[in-house]
Amino acid sequence: MSRELGIALQGFDTNVVKKTLETNYFGTLEATQELLPLIRRGGRLVNVSSAAGRLNKYSEEIRNAFLQAAKTDVPAVTALMAKFQDAVTEGSEQRAGFPRAAYAVSKAGETAFTKVIAMEAEKEGRGLLINACCPGYVKTDMARGGGVKTPDEGAQTPVMLALQDIGGKTGRFWQSEAEADW
């Protein structure tokens, strides 16, 4: 992930968007799809997303499209990533309702597909708990000297989701060891 933030700090253009989506959206999606069949009943999957992916930065139309895609299927979420990439290529991402932030859009996509996969696993009766979370702003190389949490503090929410009793909740977004608005 530190590689991705380094890319994002290089500016904002089609190349930055492509590399960011490849890492955060498509990379995480592919890893999730490969690992999911290996997870036994009662297992858990936790995707580390970000509060940067919250939907409050989008037009109502795009926000609703994300919410609908998260209830539909992975191709619907992937189509939103393509729509963002196309809008950036045309220089119209803000007119199209997206923020001018590749990292934020990639993390919104990651949270959305995590919700879809959780919904699908639940329909299949797999007995899995699948959630996305934000570790917070952690003092790592990725934060380039910033960050307010230690790595141990940043790990608290993902570890909680992986190991502790979360009341059977799946398909949610979490931050600071609690369910959070997406």
Regions found by a protein language model. Give the residues of each.
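Conserved residues in the N-terminal Rossmann fold of short-chain dehydrogenase/reductase
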Residues: 22
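Short conserved AdoMet
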Residues: 39-41, 166
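C-terminal helical subdomain
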Residues: 30, 132-140, 144-182
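Catalytic loop of short-chain dehydrogenase/reductase
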Residues: 2-18, 41-123, 134, 145
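Hydrophobic positions on the long internal alpha-helix
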Residues: 31-35, 39, 113-114, 161
